[in-house]
């Protein structure tokens, strides 16, 4: 990968020496951070061969190739050192923005030392493109270019989803369908990028700003990183093309200025996306706590009622089943073993029930030791089999606690099955299922009774 990334950088040199885009160092740093197992002799040797091979096959001299490779290695491994050092020193925090600090410090200092090493070594080599009298302009050109490359490439490596996550997303039948409004920020960005080529000038750097803010507030980090890279590369190409034609005498200082502007634009967009994701995550956590029972992590009664009312009215549902279950002699369990064991029994029951339900089935703690399940589009036989399976699983899977004998318990279950559309309100249906549960208790407990 390093070899092909180097070739890409070599083939994008607008002048005789500095590449327009050099992704290799950011790629290698990202891989070493994301996959620590690559920090082995074989991994480092492979990267070294990739750097050397790419320059040699493009007719660079051996000595110059070695000098460039060492400069790149200094940038990557000093950046890796500062990343590990900063992450170890920073206190743990729930703020996702603070997790960016090691990356920002690693890129800034790693690129600094890589550029410093390059200007101290390369001008002294034969056939060098660097001159001693231009050390500092070359230093800032190298440094700014490397940081911009990192802003473009590094987030793609670090935020890329794992293959298991990709497969889960593909196999998930309940993924929200992409709607036109989801693509509006991207379309706005395409329009703003096109404007940088049509109405180009120094202000072109700001054309995509509003669309980038919109995208940062709308998309996940990896998707935003892809968009951010596209915008930065496009702006870099269009704006530098303008100054190549018009400001040849101060090309390098102008390029440095453009790069700094793009670095700030790209980094600010990424930080905004992280802040937005952090806010959305906190909102989801608060919403989850508001809709679920804190002990069993099942739906609470209010949330269950709202979702069940929607299920009753949904046009695609042709039947509904309610399963009401209650732990037998739960008060005796609490009196004999204590409330801690009672709480663990409730958690044990909820875990067993969840393992026997589909993802979209509704499962609620109705109060105390009583639970209720709503199934949609099941026939009566399927519902009875599910209820009986749950009863048997609970009966034959006792609660295991440390330093304690297994504690077994049973449940009584009442089942109601209806065809839709139906007129009775939800509470009337729950009462019928509860009456069936009462009959199960009355007939000796640990059984399933169908509502009449």
PLM-predicted stretches and their roles:
Residues 136-145, 255:
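Short aromatic-rich membrane-water interface segments that cap or initiate transmembrane helices
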Residues 287-309, 325-339, 347:
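Conserved nucleotide-binding and Mg2+-coordinating catalytic segments in signaling enzymes
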